[in-house]
Amino acid sequence: MENKVKIGKVYRHFKGNYYLVENVALDSETKERMVVYKPIYDRTDSKIRVRCEKMFLEEIDSSRPDNITGQKYRFELAKDIEKDYIQNK
């Protein structure tokens, strides 16, 4: 199964926090695809983040001490909280 970024979906970072993907942008210099996202775990933090798509989707070592979720990828689709987030938006 191919791992692709889905705009408008909630993702969980391997350290446990949740983020909403707002868009995918193109770096004007390198032409690299960039994921545009914001945190939803802290409603007072409205800072937009940008990370290259390759890194956003990269596999990580599930045995890393800071990988509290044990997940395979840096960011994974968070189906478990998406409905709650949409209802409480």
Language model segments and positions:
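Mixed-charge, low-complexity intrinsically disordered regions
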Residues: M1-K89
